[in-house]
Structure formats: C-alpha cells, structure tokens
Amino acid sequence: MVTASLPTPVQPEFDTTIHRRKTRPVPVGAVTVGGGHPVVVQSMINEDTLDVDGSVAGIRRLHEIGCEIVRVTVPSMAHAKALADIKQKLQATYQAVPLVADVHHNGMKIALEVAKHVDKVRINPGLYVFEKPDAQREGYSDQEFAEIGEKIRETLEPLVISLRDQGKSMRIGVNHGSLSERMLFTYGDTPEGMVQSALEFIKICESLDFRNLVVSMKASRVPVMLAAYRLMVKRMDELGMDYPLHLGVTEAGDGEYGRIKSTAGIATLLADGIGDTIRVSLTEAPEKEIPVCYSILQALGLRKTMVEYVACPSCGRTLFNLEDVLHEVREATKHLTGLDIAVMGCIVNGPGEMADADYGYVGKQAGYIALYRGREEIKRVPETDGVQELINLIKADGRWVDP
C-alpha cells in the first residue's frame, strides 16, 4: 500500500507590526502629538498652581524622568495668572516644558488668560458651559438643545480664535462621569453621548478654521472607555476627521490594580493602532505614572526606552535560582537601552524562546550556564562567572556603555 505524502503546509506571513491610525500632527510646545510621531507620555502635577515654586519643582521632576507634556489645573483667574510666573521661572531655572492647563466650570475668561501662557488648553465639554441640573426636567426640546449649543459656541469662540492665532492647541477632553445634562437626556449615559459631546465642540472649532485638536474619551470603567474611543474613531472616519487621541482610564486607583486597569484600557487601544498620547492616572505621586507609561509602550513595541528582558517563569527543570540571577543580570545591564537580554532556566525551551534576543543566559547543566549571541551559543561558563562573562561578551561586541 502506497501512502501519499501530505504537502508541507505553507506558513502564512504574519505581520506583528502595530499599524497606527493616521492622524494629523498637533503641536504642543516643542512636542508633536499625532502625525506618525512616537506616542507621547504625559502626566499632571498635584501642586496648587498658586504655589509657583512648588509647581515649577513638580513640573521639573516629571519632565526629568521622561514626562513629555505636563498638565496643571487652573480653577480660578488667580491660578491662571500664576502660570505666567511658572512659565518664566521654568525657563529661567530649567528649560521650557510643554504645558497644558485644565479649565472647567464656566471657564471662558480663565481660558483666555491661560491661553497666553501654556501650549495647550484642555476643556471638558460637559463643564465648559455649566448647566445647573433641574430635578423637574424631563427632557430637552430641539429648540432648547440648539439654544444651549449656540451659547456654547459664543463662549468657546474667543478661546478658539486665541489659540488659532497663536498656533497653540486644545484638547477636547470628554469624561463619562461629567456629561452635560442635555447630552444625558438626549443620548443617555452612553459612549454615544460622549462622542456627540466631543463632535459638537470639534465642529465649532472647525467652523472657525481651528484644527490643532486632540480628543480624549475617558471613563473609569475600562469597557466604557474602550467603547467610547472605538466609537469616536468610527465617527471621525465617517466624517473625514483625523484628530489624534489622548488615551487614559480616569480614576484608575492605585497600586497593582490601578496599573493593571490602566494597562487594560490603554494597551488594548494602542494594540489596535488607536492612540497618540497617553496618561496613566494613579492615586499616587505623579512620578509613579511615568514608568508605567513607558512599560506599556515598550511591551507593545511602540517605543524602546529600556532593556527588554525575556525570562521563563521557572519550573522543575530550572538549573539555577532564576529569580536571583535575573535580578543580578538586570542590575548589571539595565542601563543598556535598546538591548534584548534573555535569562532562561534550562536548554529545553531556552534557546528557542529567546531566539529574538540579542544575548542569552541559559542553564546548561548543574553549576554551568551557556551564553548566547542571538541563536549562537558562544561559550559555557561556571554559573558563578555568568553575569560577568555576559558583560564581557557585550563589551567584546562594542555594545557596552558604562552606567
């Protein structure tokens, strides 16, 4: 009996690149958001803006660890005027830092003052023209809806013109928890209401020939946040809009869960090519947010700002204390930005799973490890010499820099 041989299956070409949504470039000081530029990392100081020295110190701390845009809150005219001193002192004692100011309730006059001193103004459509809730109201007629829309236009127009004429930018920052009453009655407490709220403000800006816009659709629940951003992208695509998106899960909390929650929302969208700037909002010191942002971007291959470590979870085959050795390797090499280094416990899966790494440290037999350059085994050395020999190999290749 002749057995027919099966044809060798053809392996499809898998594209592992994240193809980012095409967006227009929007300037924020010396930084550009969108337009194919790297995803920008930002945060917000928690100092009172009236405390000029404290605010300057807070902005500087964030900027020095990689925060590329820093936001401040401006709840009053006094806070707005303090921004002039903050900006001047930053330039005199440090350097210019791209600044964004948050403006909320009935903020037109404040926003006009703020626009003189910062690079971008963030407004919340649900609060910019504040509507006092009416417990007796059962809805809005078309006329009432339109009248409030006209009031919004009248209030927003001076700010738009000021930003347009200065070449500055605006973030239209919708929050699920602060939709206006008329949007809630008309569209419900839904992603659709969030999208319509943003589109109303975008169209006013476009009618005044102002398109330096960034849009955000934040929510404290990840599924709502994801739905809102995806619907916003769908609507913008239908309308021929290409505004960059600022991603974030608002009020994510603290600790491990706050980081996981933020990552679940932000990384899911980034993996789909959605998002041009990110903030991880934690109930912790703002400085704690920045490493999380860069870790998300590194994990997705969108920005490489640190060493990428590949390490197995350890099992009964592991030939050395994997956790301790990984710590030693990390401490010795963490400054070598751009390298991929693998630490694997045994040769069963080690060489295959670390094939994309620049260097590998693999358990070979009891008391010995093998060092790899890519897929090639270079040498076997005693485990006690492993970390130093790894350093020597990197140095021999000319890829070492002193910390």
From Swiss-Prot:
Cofactor(s) of this protein: [4Fe-4S] cluster
Give the residues the record marks as binding [4Fe-4S] cluster. C312, C315, C346, E353
List the GO biological process terms: isopentenyl diphosphate biosynthetic process, methylerythritol 4-phosphate pathway; terpenoid biosynthetic process
Which top class of enzyme applies to this chain? Answer: oxidoreductase
This protein's gene is called: ispG
Originating organism: Synechocystis sp. (strain ATCC 27184 / PCC 6803 / Kazusa)
Which is an annotated GO molecular function term of this record? iron ion binding
Q: What PANTHER family does this protein map onto? A: 4-HYDROXY-3-METHYLBUT-2-EN-1-YL DIPHOSPHATE SYNTHASE, 4-HYDROXY-3-METHYLBUT-2-EN-1-YL DIPHOSPHATE SYNTHASE (FERREDOXIN), CHLOROPLASTIC
Family as reported in the entry's similarity comment: Belongs to the IspG family.
Q: Which Pfam families match?
A: GcpE (PF04551)
Cofactor binding note? Binds 1 [4Fe-4S] cluster.
Name recorded for this polypeptide: 4-hydroxy-3-methylbut-2-en-1-yl diphosphate synthase (ferredoxin)
Which pathway does the UniProt entry assign to this protein? Answer: Isoprenoid biosynthesis; isopentenyl diphosphate biosynthesis via DXP pathway; isopentenyl diphosphate from 1-deoxy-D-xylulose 5-phosphate: step 5/6
Q: Chaperone: present as a keyword of the record?
A: no
